[in-house]
A protein has these predicted regions:
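Bacterial N-terminal signal peptides
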Residues: 5-14
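N-terminal hydrophobic targeting/anchoring segments and the immediately downstream early-domain regions
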Residues: 19-191, 244-397
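Histidine-centered catalytic micro-motifs
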Residues: 37-44, 216, 234-237
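Distinct, well-ordered alpha-helical segments
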Residues: 51, 155-159, 220-230
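Alpha-helix-loop-beta-strand connector modules within alpha/beta enzyme cores
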Residues: 190-205, 224-234
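Substrate-binding cleft of carbohydrate-active enzyme catalytic domains
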Residues: 199-220, 251-259
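Acidic, glycine-rich loop-and-beta core segments that form the ion-binding/anion-interacting portion
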Residues: 218, 225-261
């Protein structure tokens, strides 16, 4: 380690902060703007049904806990990504399946309604070509994905229904085992995929939909990789070498994923042990309704959140740790197999990268690490578009 002499250190400290090189320079920002930047896991649709919440208005993370809106997409140079149809899992029974199906369909309708209401700034896309055309026209793009296939029940024809609605990616499972597969945080009911889950893989391949292995158990991941005729991705996962959690993947499996042409999109959750307490969940539900609170209610909520964070911070993970995770994945898998999937609006964000306005920090850091602009463009979005083309080209075979 190089140690500065006292005179040199004094000189450095005497330079005003404004005169030092900014973390994201004008050249960094220009390079960032030349790339198509996307994230594969945007949970923002949870806000689309909150009364008074406006996707077209800039919100503050400190107020309503949101991390994405159109102004912040502009600020962060986020061209688009996969807006998630998420359904919290309930009963594995006909009544539960029916309720979940209806909730998932309504979430898809909400995504399309919000996009249509902002058509001058964002459009729906189902292919890489459509996304690229939207970017060239000066607009953002919205792909759609399903997190947790529980709403399909035992009716795989619903995959085609969601495909017709524009959905182009789905994962079999979330935080609990379901009718398709074992979860990374489940009990191991099936030892991987169920018989129905194996048919789910075949139907996903037939339709040309990306298979998302995030939240899958190790056995489920192994079987997805073995059975799929097209590359699979992990839309929001990370290396187990950085944080030993079942939601992350070990290096050997990361190498196998890359060898099969797949991708790991780097998560900003599961870098450390986060506070996922019921108390925090309750406060975050109150935050989502920020726009409808009066001044006294807002002061009370802010005080309650500050008190909780003083006792038990949500995360101690910072931007440097996030980049360590990404750089580890690049070293293990290669630059052609890594991308962005930070779990925005679903628990993601780290200290120093609290919302998507901070995305230029990632491409700037990769420039500092010596990556070429072409390789950085792969990580920021190009890899996903390449794999999406491969998956869609393999449809129907």
């Amino acid at each position: 380690m190089r140690i500065l002499s006292l005179p040199a250190l004094a000189l450095l400290l005497a330079i005003p902060a404004s005169a030092r090189q900014p973390e994201v320079t004008a050249a960094d920002r220009a390079a960032h703007e030349r790339m198509i930047v996307l994230d594969t896991h945007l949970d923002t649709p949870v806000y689309f049904e909150v009364p008074g919440w406006d996707f077209a208005r800039r919100h503050l993370y400190a107020e309503d806990n949101s991390q994405i809106d159109l102004p912040r997409m502009d600020a962060g140079g986020l061209d688009g990504g996969f807006f998630v149809i998420y359904t919290a899992q309930g009963a594995l029974a006909p009544e539960g399946y029916a309720q979940a199906r209806d909730a998932a369909l309504m979430r898809a309708v909400a995504i399309q309604r919000v996009v249509a209401a902002n058509a001058a700034r964002i459009g729906l896309a189902t292919t890489p070509d459509e996304a690229e055309r939207l970017v060239r026209s000066g607009r953002h793009f919205a792909f759609q994905s399903i997190e947790n296939s529980w709403p399909l029940g035992e009716d795989l024809s619903l995959l085609a229904t969601f495909h017709r609605l524009g959905v182009r990616m789905a994962g079999p499972v979330h935080s609990r085992d379901n009718q398709f597969a074992d979860s990374a945080t489940g009990q191991g009911r099936w030892h991987g995929l169920s018989p129905l889950g194996r048919r789910w893989v075949a139907e996903m391949n037939r339709l040309g939909m990306i298979i998302d292995g995030s939240h899958s158990s190790d056995e489920t991941f192994d079987q997805l990789l073995a059975l799929s005729r097209a590359p699979i991705i992990l839309s929001h996962s990370g290396p187990r070498a950085i944080f030993n959690h079942r939601r992350n993947l070990d290096d050997a499996r990361m190498r196998r994923l890359a060898a099969a042409g797949g991708l790991m999109m780097i998560n900003s959750v599961f870098l450390v042990e986060n506070d996922l307490s019921d108390e925090r969940d309750a406060l975050q539900e109150r935050q989502k309704n920020w726009g409808n609170l009066d001044a006294a209610q807002r002061r009370r909520l802010t005080a309650d959140l500050a008190a909780l964070n003083a006792r038990r911070p949500y995360t101690t993970a910072d931007f440097d740790l996030y980049m360590r995770s990404m750089l580890h994945a690049i070293r293990v898998m290669g630059v052609d197999h890594v991308g962005l999937g930070a779990d925005w609006d679903g628990g993601g964000g780290v200290i120093g990268m609290e919302d998507i306005a901070a995305l230029p920090r990632i491409s700037a850091r990769l420039r500092r690490e010596g990556f070429s602009e072409a390789d950085i463009a792969k990580v920021m979005g190009g890899n996903l578009l390449r794999v999406m083309r491969q998956v869609q080209a393999a449809a129907g075979r």
